[in-house]
């Protein structure tokens, strides 16, 4: 059934709630509703059931006659779409069906595939029809027959035409040529009109065969592509109808046999065709033979589409596009084939065909095909541009309000692929920086190829427009390095209408007008052919100074990921996502190429921040890339700064062999540090390199020299104990190895590089972190925290209050020596943040306890211990009795009570590191002894006596009494002479003796 695809929800999305307009659209098409009426009756039960189920009734046996607005609306929609479908020609139907198929899910597509196969098998018709279809299918893929058609089309005289047919047939014997509906007449009396008719017949023949072209038939495809420039030139001379060429272009845009490179080769001619149609619609040609606007349209009405313009804003997008466009630019010739009469049906409308805009070049020429594109016409049956294509302007037509699209299926196919028309469609359709693709990337490439095909407005041939210099060479990829000659066949034979106007200036203004910074985040394709096509615009016109105009050929250029100074602020006005510096994804700039050594060109350009010019190198070989000059880059539209930078970088690529040779020699002789060599490798690893196995002289094998330097650096790091091994050098070297593993030049050596990277990773893990002091576990209050930095003695504070240069221990408690009596208390003090230490190491005079430290520069356990030196140890003190110590402590505490608390009286401070301090040693009648030690000496003796427990119990009442005394410290209550008693108390409590100095 013809409306099978209409059951998709996309068909009903664009015209909900517009019953009256749909009725009016159906009433307008009564002459063609005989067949659709039956189809409508047949479709009513199914439509009713579907709508009923959608409304919440799951019963499939619902009454079909039940009146519901949704059911009636769907039936009217089916009728409207069916009527429109019946009015379209074969090419228009194909384009619309292609657009609708992109909206279906996989099960629906498979169902349609089975249905199409069954229909092709059962409904081929009679044997005569079957034979005719087979013959057309064979001829469509026969290069000999297609070459005969091409020769016949390019021949002007009938006799030459016949000779060309016979000679080419005798030379080729690969495949037999079958007959078709194309016949050549040998009458010598053929006038110009009959010659035009023969050319038109040839185009009809090509139009019938082009959909049957099989993918993979490169020879036949090249003949089809070769016909395009000649047909476009004949269209500009008004020899053949414009609609035929538009239909051929529309098939080429969506044909699976046409690659992106082929579509880019068509960009010049598609843009020429568009400008010719616009000029013809504006009345600039000598005779408006095919595109004369109808009087009804100028008057504001049309016999076939009087309600189209009014319904375009409310009815189905397909119906509005078709009906409005069918009344916008109708062919005036009535003798044309019926399949070309309605060719303009799905073109977007032009509401103001006769407006003149002073700022537009078309307005200066005498007329303007002005019209703002109807937003609903940018939808195809409810399929918005956002749903059908990527967010970028996929035909590159950044159309202002004064321009219009190609009035044909080229525009229809472009709308299907996401043509933006007007300022509403220049904004980004991405959501949070994510592209929305409703179809496969192949179609996206096709849409971009269409955009690139419509991005060039310059004429191609100069001088005589009849001269055939427009045919592309057999190898289409060779056009990139040679900018083709340009001429002014843009207007065909109507150049005299422009008078004194400089065509080059006009072309550059057109290119600048249609160039808008792409809002897309994708970086898929840029036209290398279109880059070449605008070289004359850039070199001839001096007004094209800014980057927006110089990049006219990059109408669909990828979004730059850097807001560099090359892009002026004016180019960022309408950018929806340029302010977001997204994370660059390397897969966006990778492309598959058959040229050896060029697969990594994208990463190299990204490192230079010139990745938007990646498509210039897509079809280049490695040798061609090294021959690029700054003049060539500017000729293809690269800005002056970028071309200069890129040319300098290419010159540096030629010096890589000398740089690697120098690095290798200096590493072997020890004249270069490893960090310098690693830096040189970093600059080279991202550059394009040929594989090691590529033929050529060894001195030019950059990859081999690169691996030699890598081997020398890694061997030095692993084997040389004097090599500077640090985290930074190892990290950069591992990054270089990671990039080398994925480099095309080292694909056959990836396993060796992985092993080398693994060895370096183990070496990096085994390295000790820099600037961190390692302590054994259990030493110090932090229990040997390995991450604690060592204190540098040079950066520590000094003691300025006593005029001494000795450094102060940087601890929380930095009081003088008289605080010992306070710190002798066993209870934890409030200013201590550590956990209560065990009893024995509570007073640690090595600088880790709460008291003052008298050995700060030797607090680390990494310094040598003097325990094993018996010559420097004084004799151990004799053991004391517990009752003797208790009596001494009672006497000292009684002395403390005779001195009242005087907070304002501070005893004179003595230098706590002075060597003249008296240190009392336990034992005997407790006479003070003066011990003078040299720095670096220490005394540590152990005594197994542990009879100080009774003394601790006697201290508990005194400690509580001291807490209640008002918080006055013992240092403020005792004179300096009690120092001996304090030291004796410490020695009586503990068994370790430390020498303080």
From Swiss-Prot:
SMART domains: SAM. GO terms for molecular function: mRNA binding; translation repressor activity. PANTHER family: PROTEIN SMAUG (PTHR12515:SF5), STERILE ALPHA MOTIF DOMAIN CONTAINING PROTEIN 4-RELATED (PTHR12515). Keywords: Cytoplasm, Developmental protein, Phosphoprotein, Repressor, RNA-binding, Translation regulation. Its main location: cytoplasm. Residues 1-69, 329-370, 773-892, 944-972 are annotated as: Disordered. Disulfide bonds: none annotated. The gene is smg. Coiled coil: none annotated. Belongs to the SMAUG family. Residues 44-69, 329-338 have a biased composition (Low complexity). Interacts with oskar (osk). Binds to the 3'-UTR of nos. Interacts with cup, which in turn recruits eIF4-E, leading to an indirect interaction between smg and eIF4-E that prevents mRNA translation. This is Protein Smaug. It comes from Drosophila erecta. Residues 1-37, 802-822, 854-864 have a biased composition (Polar residues). The modification Phosphoserine is found at residues 564, 575, 970. The SAM domain mediates the association with the 3'-UTR of specific mRNAs. It is found in: Cytoplasm. Residues 583-763 are annotated as: Interaction with cup. GO terms for biological process: negative regulation of translation; nuclear-transcribed mRNA poly(A) tail shortening; regulation of DNA-templated transcription. GO terms for cellular component: cytoplasm; P-body. Translation regulator that binds to the 3'-UTR of specific mRNAs such as nanos (nos) and prevent their translation. Prevents translation of unlocalized nos in the bulk cytoplasm via the recruitment of cup. Residues 600-654 form the SAM domain.
């Amino acid at each position: 059934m013809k409306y099978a695809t209409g059951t998709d929800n996309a068909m009903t999305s664009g015209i909900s709630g517009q019953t009256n307009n749909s009725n009016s659209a159906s009433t307008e098409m009564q002459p063609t509703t005989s067949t659709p009426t039956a189809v409508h009756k047949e479709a009513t039960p199914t439509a009713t059931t579907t709508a009923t189920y959608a409304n919440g009734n799951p019963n499939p046996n619902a009454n079909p006659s039940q009146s519901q607005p949704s059911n009636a609306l769907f039936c009217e929609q089916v009728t409207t779409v069916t009527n429109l479908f019946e009015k379209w020609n074969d090419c228009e139907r194909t384009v619309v069906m292609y657009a609708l198929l992109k909206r279906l899910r996989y099960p629906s597509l498979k169902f349609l595939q089975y249905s199409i196969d069954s229909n092709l098998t059962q409904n081929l018709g009679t044997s005569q029809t079957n034979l005719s279809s087979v013959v057309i299918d064979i001829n469509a893929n026969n290069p000999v027959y297609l070459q005969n058609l091409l020769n016949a089309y390019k021949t002007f005289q009938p006799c030459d035409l016949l000779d060309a047919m016979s000679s080419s047939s005798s030379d080729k014997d690969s495949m037999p040529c079958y007959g078709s509906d194309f016949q050549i007449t040998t009458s010598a009396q053929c006038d110009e009109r009959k010659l035009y008719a023969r050319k038109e017949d040839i185009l009809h023949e090509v139009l019938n065969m082009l959909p049957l072209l099989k993918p993979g038939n490169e020879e036949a495809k090249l003949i089809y592509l070769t016909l395009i420039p000649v047909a476009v030139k004949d269209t500009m001379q008004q020899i053949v109808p414009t609609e035929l060429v538009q239909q051929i272009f529309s098939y080429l845009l969506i044909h699976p046999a046409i690659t992106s490179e082929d579509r880019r080769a068509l960009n010049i001619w598609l843009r020429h065709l568009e400008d010719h149609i616009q000029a013809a619609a504006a009345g600039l040609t000598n005779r408006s033979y095919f595109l004369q606007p109808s009087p009804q349209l100028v008057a504001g009405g049309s016999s076939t589409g009087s309600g189209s313009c009014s319904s375009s804003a409310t009815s189905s997008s397909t119906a509005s596009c078709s009906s409005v466009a069918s009344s916008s630019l109708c062919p005036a010739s009535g003798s044309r084939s019926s399949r070309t009469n309605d060719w303009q049906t799905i073109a977007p409308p032009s509401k103001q065909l006769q407006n003149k805009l002073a700022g537009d070049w078309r307005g200066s020429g005498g007329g303007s095909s002005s019209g703002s594109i109807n937003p609903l016409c940018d939808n195809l049956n409810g399929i918005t541009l956002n749903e059908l294509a990527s967010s970028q302007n996929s035909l590159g037509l950044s159309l202002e309000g004064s321009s219009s699209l190609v009035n044909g299926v080229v525009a229809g196919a472009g709308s299907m692929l996401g043509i933006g028309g007007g300022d509403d469609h220049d904004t980004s359709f991405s959501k949070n920086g994510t592209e929305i693709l409703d179809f496969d990337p192949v179609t996206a490439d096709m849409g971009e190829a269409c955009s690139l095909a419509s991005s060039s407005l310059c004429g191609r041939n100069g001088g005589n427009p009849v001269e055939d210099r427009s045919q592309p060479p057999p190898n289409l990829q060779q056009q990139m390095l040679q900018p083709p000659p340009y001429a002014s066949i843009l207007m065909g034979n109507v150049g005299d209408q422009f008078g004194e106007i400089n065509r080059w200036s006009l072309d550059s203004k057109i290119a600048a007008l249609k160039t808008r910074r792409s809002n897309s985040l994708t970086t898929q394709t840029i036209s290398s052919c279109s880059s070449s096509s605008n070289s004359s615009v850039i070199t001839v016109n001096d007004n094209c100074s800014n980057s927006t105009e110089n990049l006219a050929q990059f109408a669909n250029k990828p979004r730059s990921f850097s807001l560099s100074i090359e892009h002026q602020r004016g180019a960022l006005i309408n950018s929806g996502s340029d302010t977001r510096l997204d994370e660059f994804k390397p897969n966006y700039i990778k492309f598959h190429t058959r040229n050896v050594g060029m697969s990594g060109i994208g990463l190299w350009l990204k490192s230079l921040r010139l990745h938007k010019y990646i498509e210039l190198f897509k079809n280049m070989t490695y040798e061609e890339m090294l021959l690029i000059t700054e003049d060539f880059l500017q000729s293809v539209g690269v800005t002056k700064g970028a071309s200069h930078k890129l040319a300098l970088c290419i010159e540096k690529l030629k010096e890589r062999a000398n740089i690697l040779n120098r690095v290798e020699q200096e590493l072997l002789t020890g004249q270069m540090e490893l960090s310098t060599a690693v830096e040189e490798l970093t600059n080279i690893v991202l550059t394009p390199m040929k594989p090691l196995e590529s033929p050529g002289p060894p001195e030019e094998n950059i990859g081999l020299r690169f691996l030699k330097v890598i081997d020398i650096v890694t061997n030095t790091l692993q084997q040389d104990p004097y090599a500077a091994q640090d985290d930074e050098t190892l990290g950069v070297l591992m990054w270089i190895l990671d990039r080398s593993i994925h480099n095309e030049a080292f694909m056959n050596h990836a396993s060796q590089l992985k092993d080398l990277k693994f060895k370096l990773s183990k070496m990096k893990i085994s390295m000790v972190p820099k600037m961190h002091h390692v302590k054994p576990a259990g030493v110090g209050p932090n229990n040997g925290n390995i991450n604690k930095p060592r204190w540098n003695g040079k950066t520590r504070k000094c003691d300025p209050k006593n005029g001494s240069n000795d450094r102060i221990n940087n601890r929380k408690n930095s009081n003088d020596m008289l605080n010992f009596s306070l710190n002798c208390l066993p209870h934890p003090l409030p200013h201590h943040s550590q956990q209560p230490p065990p009893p024995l190491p509570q007073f640690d005079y090595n600088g880790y306890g709460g008291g003052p430290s008298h050995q700060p520069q030797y607090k680390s356990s990494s310094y040598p211990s003097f325990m094993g030196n018996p010559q420097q140890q004084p004799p151990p003190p004799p053991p004391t009795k517990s009752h003797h110590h208790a009596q001494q402590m009672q006497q000292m505490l009684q002395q403390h009570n005779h001195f009242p608390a005087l907070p304002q009286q501070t005893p004179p401070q003595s230098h706590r590191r002075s060597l003249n301090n008296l240190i009392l040693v336990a034992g005997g009648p407790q006479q003070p002894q003066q011990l003078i030690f040299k720095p670096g000496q220490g005394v540590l003796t152990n005594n197994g006596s542990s009879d100080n427990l009774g003394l601790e119990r006697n201290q508990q009442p005194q400690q509580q009494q001291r807490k209640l005394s008002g918080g006055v410290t013992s240092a403020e209550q005792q004179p300096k002479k009690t120092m001996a008693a304090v030291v004796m108390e410490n020695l009586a409590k503990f068994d370790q003796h430390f020498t303080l100095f």
